[in-house]
Design a protein with these regions (language model features):
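Membrane-helix interface segments
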Residues: 12-17, 83, 96-99, 132, ...
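Membrane-helix interface linkers and caps
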Residues: 2-10, 30, 34-102, 118-131, ...
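Membrane-interface helix/loop boundary segments of multi-pass membrane proteins
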Residues: 149-170, 197, 201-206
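Aromatic-anchored segments of alpha-helical transmembrane domains
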Residues: 24-32, 109-114, 170-171, 214-224
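Alpha-helical transmembrane segments
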Residues: 16-28, 64-68, 101-112
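Hydrophobic alpha-helical segments embedded in the membrane of multi-pass proteins
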Residues: 186-195
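C-terminal membrane module of polytopic membrane proteins
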Residues: 39, 176-181, 202-275
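Juxtamembrane helix-entry segments on the extracytoplasmic side of multipass membrane proteins
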Residues: 127-140, 173-187
Length: 275
């Protein structure tokens, strides 16, 4: 059932356009308090009135859940969008081969460590190889809120509708239109989107597997933070480039139309041709 949703060319495109507009609106609303209270995030120390801090917290959470919130609203209220149940049904598709959960859980580790190795090879020795995050509740929140708040939208709603018409890279490339601070953020977002699309399609549309991958990235990023002194933010750029390298390997090793194994994609094409 879920695999059919991934490959279904009949899903209408209009709902995803409405979804994209709604995501942009929600993200914009989430940015307003930051522009009002913290125009320069590099100088943010947390020394703000309690009401402003609370508003910033609400804004962060609103932006974090924007993609999924928009997807649920559009699927629920817009004719032809499939209904909210069809979206939540993908969350029940958790019975996939265990190797995909291992990949989702462990893949960020070699990628992040590779960035640290490159950092050392460049002669920059101020590394923190493994730390326990000081804000454990924040780390737990980062492992839960972004996967739940984003993947119902990006993977569960947008990807099946976009990839058959415009290509599997469009859902990830569309993140270029999200507001961000630096180029490395776009590189990382698009690269992780390719990786998550690969997992999603290869598992026949398993949102739990993708959410594990998303959560694993956030958790491992907290435990393997990399450079301790990095005024030019070279460390995050190296991490983003390593994610880009992993995404390129996936693209080269799979069918570029679906990011699934070439043999698997050929068998699907033969089955469609036979019917």
């Amino acid at each position: 059932m879920q695999a059919a949703a991934v490959d279904n060319p009949r899903l209408p495109l209009r709902p995803v356009l409405v979804w994209a507009a709604l995501v942009a609106i929600i993200s914009g609303l989430g940015l307003i308090p930051f522009y009002a209270f913290v125009p320069d995030l590099s100088k943010f120390t947390g020394n703000l009135p309690a009401a402003q801090l609370a508003l910033l917290g609400i804004a962060v959470e609103l932006a974090a859940v924007g993609p999924s919130l928009a997807a649920i609203l559009v699927a629920w209220r817009m004719p032809g969008a499939g209904g909210a149940r069809s979206l939540f049904r993908q969350f029940r598709h958790w019975r996939v081969h265990p190797i995909w959960y291992l990949i989702a859980l462990l893949l960020p580790i070699p990628i992040l460590l590779a960035a640290d190795v490159i950092w050392m090879a460049l002669g920059r020795q101020s590394l923190v190889w493994l730390t326990v995050p000081g804000a454990i509740p924040f780390t737990i929140g980062a492992a839960l809120v972004p996967p739940l708040g984003e993947e119902f939208g990006w993977r569960g709603f947008a990807q099946p509708r976009l990839q058959r018409r415009l290509g599997v890279f469009v859902p990830g490339g569309s993140k270029l239109f999200l507001p961000s601070d630096v180029a490395q953020t776009y590189i990382r977002l698009i690269s992780t989107a390719v990786i998550y699309a690969w997992i999603y399609n290869s598992t026949g549309g398993s949102l739990p597997a993708v959410m594990v991958a998303h959560a694993a990235h956030n958790i491992h990023s907290g435990f393997i933070p990399g450079a301790s002194v990095d005024p030019r933010h070279l460390g995050p750029l190296l991490g983003a480039l390593c994610y880009a390298a992993a995404a390129i390997v996936i693209v080269l090793a799979t069918n570029r139309g679906t990011l699934t194994r070439r043999l698997q994609a050929s068998h699907r094409a033969l089955r469609r041709g036979g019917t």
